[in-house]
Regions:
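Extreme N-terminal leader/targeting segments of oxidoreductases
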Residues: 1-6, 24-25, 469-471, 476, ...
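A glycine-rich dinucleotide-binding beta-alpha-beta segment and adjacent secondary-structure elements
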Residues: 186-203, 367-380, 432-496
Length: 519
């Protein structure tokens, strides 16, 4: 007799969600986690004494509030902070910054007053444009997805089909130029919006297919509402842990899995690196597909065409995170001085234009550190003082396009170079910034690969691109969370709908298990 009804591998937010849903439905559940903490690539860690930093994800960018209700997370202590603005995206002094107010009326007033009626019309236009895609997302979100090509073909009219084709297969700028056509007047808005199109991808804003990532980021969650959990991003996972434990499940920390135990094509449990074997009726993996199938299952247990499909998944996702402690907040000057008067400076993003992003992309894809990196600079303790000692502050810079295939001997040198360049981008507009830094640590995709076991350090668990989304995620034929191995299921970001903190792949993976369990 198996020791558990279900074992979930990985205590990130998706793995924990799957475990909790199963436990709530009466199954005995064990979640095994490699590290000594929960959260995966959405954890809050004390990197420096007294300071808490969000390692990996830093806000709920594509989260839907309904998941809080489905998992009853407020009951287990989750409290969300809703900032006045999600970000302030800026460029050169002659460019008007874009402030991502979370209040609809406030952002409309800002666009009309500071950017002109054309910008306000443009925002309304792109919102209506993306609604066509969002209708598909909403219909397919909590189920095994259909083929996107089939959904496009079944669109009610030619105009909708054209919109969907451009969204899925066009570039981000193909979409944005329709609504913000002035390359000079609208370049800061264009740059800010198309920055989402390079997140979780291996593309630039003019690359065909980047429109899909743009649509993904602005339709999957609650747009313009970058909420953050009080206590750090890891507080979300901690609330799910409490829910899991309240329903009889538990997490076993410091328990990396060596291999899956398989008998006659059916999984029977897991073997930990310690040698301990744990049996279960079903196993769910929240890890990426390559780690799951090539690392834990083994090629010899799988059909050759399936192995080929897994090997074909792309994971090239280069980035750095710079976590810092500050003795004072930066004082922005000139055209950004207004940001010092409120918590608008919670996230300051230097993204002058889509052409600027494209230059970074060109250097990155040729293995070079961008001369002037894209830089998101967040000051989380401005919104949540519990993250830092009184009188001090936390700061994190996230920057895309750190070279992907860096020789081991050059990694530290190049990551240091890119970190300094990213800091310079902010210090250029806040002269006291560099002098305010007390401590810092630079993390790249290499750190996330070694610490969390995710292929290539790719936080998307498989890039956002047309050939790796919808019914092709994680691979064609297995978008229903099943696998070629009996009673082995997937439940992580490698599955539909995809990456980001959503809890939806975990929820859907658990539902697939329950559907079979009840038969």
């Amino acid at each position: 007799m198996a020791q558990y009804d279900a074992i979930v591998v990985g205590a990130g937010h998706n793995g924990l969600t799957a475990a909790t849903v199963l436990a709530k439905n009466g199954l005995s559940v064990l979640c095994v986690e490699k590290n000594n903490w929960a959260g995966g690539m959405a954890a809050t860690r004390e990197l420096f004494d007294g300071f808490k930093h969000n390692v990996g994800a830093w806000a709920l960018l594509v989260f839907r509030a309904e998941m809080i209700q489905r998992l009853e997370l407020e009951k287990y202590g989750l409290e969300l902070i809703r900032p006045r603005s999600s970000y302030c995206s800026f460029g050169e002094p002659e460019d008007t910054p874009l402030i991502g107010y979370t209040d609809t009326n406030e952002i409309m007033e800002h666009l009309a007053k500071d950017h002109g009626p054309g910008a306000l019309e443009g925002l309304g236009g792109i919102y209506n444009f993306l609604q066509k895609y969002k209708e598909l997302v909403d219909k397919e979100l909590f189920k095994a997805p259909s083929s996107i090509d089939t959904l496009i073909a079944e669109a009610p009219d030619a105009e909708t089909r054209e919109i969907l084709l451009k969204t899925v297969y066009g570039s981000a700028m193909d979409v944005l130029r329709q609504f913000f056509p002035d390359p000079k007047k609208h370049r800061c808005i264009q740059g800010s919006l198309c920055a989402s199109a390079i997140d979780g991808t291996h593309t630039g804003p003019f690359t065909p297919g980047s429109g899909l990532s743009l649509a993904y980021h602005y339709t999957l969650g609650d747009a313009f509402d970058f909420r953050t959990p009080k206590g750090g991003i890891g507080a979300l996972s901690q609330s799910i842990v409490k829910a899991l434990e309240d329903h009889g499940g538990r997490v076993q920390y410091g328990a990396p899995v060596k291999r899956f135990c398989i008998d006659n094509g059916k999984i029977t449990g897991v073997e930990l690196r310690s040698g301990e074997r744990i049996t279960a009726e079903v196993v769910l993996s929240s890890l990426d597909a390559r780690t799951t199938f090539l690392g834990l299952v083994g090629e010899d247990q799988l059909p050759s065409d399936f192995v080929y499909a897994v090997k074909d998944i792309e994971y090239q996702n280069g980035y750095i995170q710079i976590h810092m402690t500050l003795k004072e907040l930066p004082e922005f000057t000139g055209h950004l001085a207004f940001a010092n008067e409120s918590n608008i400076r919670w996230i300051m993003a230097y993204i002058p234009s889509p052409e600027y992003l494209a230059r970074c992309w060109e250097q990155y894809r040729h293995g070079q550190v961008p001369d002037e990196p894209v830089s998101y600079c967040a000051f989380p303790s401005v919104m949540d003082p519990s993250l830092a000692p009184a009188g001090y502050y936390t700061c994190t810079i996230f920057s895309h396009y750190f070279p992907y295939d860096v020789p081991p001997g050059k990694h530290k040198e190049l990551s240091t170079v890119m970190a300094e360049r990213a800091i310079d981008q902010i210090a250029k507009y806040a002269p006291n910034f560099r002098g305010a830094i007390m401590d810092k640590v630079v993390l790249t995709q290499q750190y996330f690969e070694s610490t969390f076991g995710v292929t290539g350090g790719d936080f998307a668990s498989g890039l956002i691109k047309p050939s790796q989304m919808w019914n092709r995620r994680p691979v064609p034929g297995y978008s229903d969370y099943s696998t070629p191995i009996g009673n082995l299921f997937m439940c992580g970001s490698a599955c539909h709908p995809g990456p980001g903190i959503t809890c939806i792949p975990g929820y859907n993976g658990a539902q697939a298990v329950l559907k079979k369990w009840k038969k």
